[in-house]
Regions:
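Carbohydrate-active catalytic/glycan-binding domains of CAZyme proteins
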Residues: 1-264
Length: 264
């Protein structure tokens, strides 16, 4: 089967569609597998769910705000241990957890010692994705670093468990070019493709709308993926608005394998 999930227009639930063919997703019936909370966390702005199969279980990573702090967007995790995520039962694992420092080191802040690392998921965080490479699993997400100006960067970390990071965040990409800074300085919506000896990460840039476009990062498959120097960024968008082709504001893609075995 092909499985499909996406932001629901009412921002209040997560649904899954299932089809034997990729074209069949369009008209496939959808099943609601989770609904937002009435109060507290996970109560508003249910955004950008992604479905992943990890170590024999299914997981959905999504972003959500609180009922009274709707823009306190953070990543959360759902888990399904059944074979079919469309038919199976889903459970909340709660928020995605940052790496916990094992002990206090000289010069380390009290905040870092008493809790999780003081950087990951402390501000507006969303659009999480995950991938495995050579026995290690990685987590990539978008997070704002300046509360007032709101620069959205991409970060990467190794994972300890499906709902917890093993390392502190590493800056993967920040809006460097003019085409990443239209109306808002944004890098978000990462998607990963392993192909031809490379690790590719596509991402979305600028404000949503006609100016929304897509950039691309790449690293050699033998590189240390937590080393920022291992990654290179294309200087120009790989997809952008093209009225002649009736393409407007492309962004936040995914990759899959088509019915004919080709990468889509």
């Amino acid at each position: 089967y092909y499985y499909f999930t996406a932001t629901y227009p009412a921002y209040d639930r997560i649904c899954i569609r299932r089809s034997a063919t990729i074209n069949g997703i369009t008209d496939a019936p959808e099943r609601e597998i989770w609904h937002k909370h009435e109060t507290g966390v996970m109560a508003s702005h249910i955004w950008a769910p992604e479905l992943h199969y990890i170590d024999g279980k299914w997981y959905i990573y999504f972003a959500a705000g609180e009922d009274k702090k709707t823009w306190e967007i953070r990543p959360y995790v759902l888990e399904c241990a059944d074979e079919d995520p469309y038919e199976g039962e889903w459970h909340e694992m709660g928020p995605m957890l940052a790496h916990r420092s094992p002990r206090k080191r000289h010069g380390e802040s009290l905040r870092a010692f008493n809790g999780y690392d003081p950087y990951s998921f402390t501000e507006f965080s969303l659009d999480a994705t995950t991938f495995e490479h050579r026995g290690k699993r990685y987590f990539i997400w978008a997070e704002k670093v300046h509360r007032r100006f709101g620069i959205s960067n991409l970060y990467i970390a190794e994972m300890e468990a499906p709902n917890k990071l093993k390392t502190v965040q590493v800056l993967l990409s920040t809006p460097d070019y003019d085409w990443e800074r239209i109306d808002f300085w944004v890098n978000e919506g990462p998607a990963v493709l392993k192909y031809g000896g490379k690790i590719f990460v596509t991402y979305s840039a600028s404000a949503t709308g006609q100016m929304y476009c897509m950039g691309m990062l790449s690293a050699d498959e033998d590189a240390d993926l937590l080393d920022p120097k291992a990654w290179s960024k294309k200087r120009y968008p790989v997809l952008q608005t093209d009225p002649d082709r009736k393409v407007f504001g492309p962004g936040h893609n995914c990759f899959t394998v088509g019915d004919d075995g080709e990468v889509l």
